Amino acid sequence: MTITIDAVILAGGMARRMGGNDKGLVELESQPMIKHAIDRINPQVKEILINANRNQKVYSEFGFEVISDQDSGYLGPLAGMITAMSHTQADYLMVVPCDCPLLPRDLVNRMLAQLTTADAELAVASDGKREQPVVMLLKPSLRASMKAFLDAGERKIDFWYAKHNYIVTDFSDQPNAFINVNTPEQKQQLSEAIANEKNNLRCK
């Protein structure tokens, strides 16, 4: 039986540390941040959902379904995940943020292989030093558990998944994979990392 996997790109936050700018639409290397994430994740999944709570018309121009949180109170990544789980019929949902332009090209395969081998409910990515809670492969059937957690006033993703049978997938071989953008300095760091990756590809 073929396993189906959809992805949701989370672009629904308020981006306070970026001065309120919509992070998914911030330009990086001549294209919006979310376009980098789309290019990385699209070959790895069946369908893409974009979770956005503003600029929905702009996001729709990327050619994928745009979904907004069912609660308009900017309740964080969990709210976006809950919404996405109600919009997918796939066996698994791959969750990624809009501001990680160097996501691994083998992200889904590695996480799925480890998840199924361990017979776990979800897999969380790690850069080898820390877990990345918003880079997660999970079963949509976990929606009820996540919604109950959020409805109870909880927000921390790692507190939620600690209640479940989860595994951590190590991507320490790709140290730049989960660099994201919260400050102008991090944006510069990412630009340099992207340039280095392009140079390495040319040398191969």
From Swiss-Prot:
<dbReference type="InterPro" id="IPR025877">
    <property type="entry name" value="MobA-like_NTP_Trfase"/>
</dbReference>
<dbReference type="Pfam" id="PF12804">
    <property type="entry name" value="NTP_transf_3"/>
</dbReference>
<protein>
    <recommendedName>
        <fullName>Molybdenum cofactor guanylyltransferase</fullName>
        <ecNumber>2.7.7.77</ecNumber>
    </recommendedName>
</protein>
<feature type="binding site">
    <location>
        <position position="99"/>
    </location>
    <ligand>
        <name>GTP</name>
    </ligand>
</feature>
<keyword id="KW-0808">Transferase</keyword>
<keyword id="KW-0342">GTP-binding</keyword>
<feature type="binding site">
    <location>
        <position position="51"/>
    </location>
    <ligand>
        <name>GTP</name>
    </ligand>
</feature>
<feature type="binding site">
    <location>
        <begin position="10"/>
        <end position="12"/>
    </location>
    <ligand>
        <name>GTP</name>
    </ligand>
</feature>
<feature type="binding site">
    <location>
        <position position="23"/>
    </location>
    <ligand>
        <name>GTP</name>
    </ligand>
</feature>
<keyword id="KW-0963">Cytoplasm</keyword>
<comment type="subunit">
    <text>Monomer.</text>
</comment>
<dbReference type="GO" id="GO:0061603">
    <property type="term" value="F:molybdenum cofactor guanylyltransferase activity"/>
</dbReference>
<dbReference type="GO" id="GO:1902758">
    <property type="term" value="P:bis(molybdopterin guanine dinucleotide)molybdenum biosynthetic process"/>
</dbReference>
<keyword id="KW-0547">Nucleotide-binding</keyword>
<dbReference type="GO" id="GO:0005737">
    <property type="term" value="C:cytoplasm"/>
</dbReference>
<comment type="function">
    <text>Transfers a GMP moiety from GTP to Mo-molybdopterin (Mo-MPT) cofactor (Moco or molybdenum cofactor) to form Mo-molybdopterin guanine dinucleotide (Mo-MGD) cofactor.</text>
</comment>
<dbReference type="GO" id="GO:0005525">
    <property type="term" value="F:GTP binding"/>
</dbReference>
<dbReference type="GO" id="GO:0046872">
    <property type="term" value="F:metal ion binding"/>
</dbReference>
<keyword id="KW-0460">Magnesium</keyword>
<keyword id="KW-0479">Metal-binding</keyword>
<feature type="binding site">
    <location>
        <position position="69"/>
    </location>
    <ligand>
        <name>GTP</name>
    </ligand>
</feature>
<dbReference type="InterPro" id="IPR013482">
    <property type="entry name" value="Molybde_CF_guanTrfase"/>
</dbReference>
<dbReference type="InterPro" id="IPR029044">
    <property type="entry name" value="Nucleotide-diphossugar_trans"/>
</dbReference>
<feature type="binding site">
    <location>
        <position position="99"/>
    </location>
    <ligand>
        <name>Mg(2+)</name>
    </ligand>
</feature>
<comment type="similarity">
    <text>Belongs to the MobA family.</text>
</comment>
<keyword id="KW-0501">Molybdenum cofactor biosynthesis</keyword>
